[in-house]
Amino acid sequence: PPYADSPNVTANGGTAGGRRHRARRKADKPRQERELMLRCMYHTVPGRVLLKMLSGRRFSALCGRFMDSSLSRPLIRRFVRKNHIDLNEYTATRYRSFNDCFTRRIRAEMRPIPHNPRALIAPCDGRLSAYRISDGLVMPIKQSWYSVSDLLGGDPIAEAYRNGVCLVFRLCVDNYHRYCYIDNGTKGRNVFLPGQLHTVRPIALSRIPVFIRNCREYTVMDTAAFGPVTQIEVGALLVGKILNHDAEARVHRGAEKGMFLYGGSTIVLLLREGAADLPDALFEK
C-alpha cells in the first residue's frame, strides 16, 4: 500500500508506535510482577507469614544447599538463555551446579586493568550510583534505606567519611559476580553483620511497617592511591551469600577479593573527602 514506506507504519499495517508500546509493555511485565509480589509479601497477612518463612535461616540454608548441588544444573540453561550470557567470555562453559555457573570466572582479557595507578577502578560489574556523604544521606539498597552508619552497623569509623564519597554498585543477575580490590595496599579484618527483619506490631495485623537490614560484610583497606577506603558487600536478607577470600593481608589492585553466591548483589565503596577526583555528572541529585 502507498503508506507502507511511512516511518510510523509497519508493512503489515500496524503502527511502529504501537509496536514500540507493546514492546515496552512486554519489557515492563517482569518488573510489574516483581512489584506486585513485593506488595503482597509486605502488605498482606499471608505475605507476611511467607516472608517470615522465606527469610529464616533454615530455609535459606536449604536453598543454598540445593543451589550448590547437581540437582540445580537444569536451571543453568534457562538462566543463561534468559539473561543473554555469553559463556565464551568465561574460563569454563560446563558447570557442576547453579552456583558454580553463577560464580563463573571471567577471562582476564575481558576486564583489563588500566595502567594509570591514580585511575579509580570499579570493584565489580554493575550499575553505579554516586553520593556525596552528608549527615542526612540515606541510600536505597535492596528494598531498604541506609545511612553510612547503618551500613557499618554503627561503627564510629563512619565519621571518617563525612563529606567524602559513597559509590554504590548494584549488580544485575546477568553480571559477573566476582569482585576485586581497587588498589594495592593492606586490608583489615572482615566484619560480618547479620541481616535483621523488624516489625513494629504483631504479624496478625493487616499492614505492618517492616524494617529490613540485609547481611553485610565490610573491611577497611589502607590503599596506596586513595588512602583509607571501606568496602562493603551486601548480601541476602538473613543468611550471607558473600564469600571473601582473605583475612588481614596485603592486597593487589585487580586481584579477586571475593564473590557473591545467588542472593548477594551490591557493593559499596566509601572514600574520604578529596581521595578521588570524580566528575560532578556522576553524582545523583
Predicted segments, located by residue:
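Contiguous, well-folded functional domains in the mature portion of proteins
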Residues: 2-3, 12-285
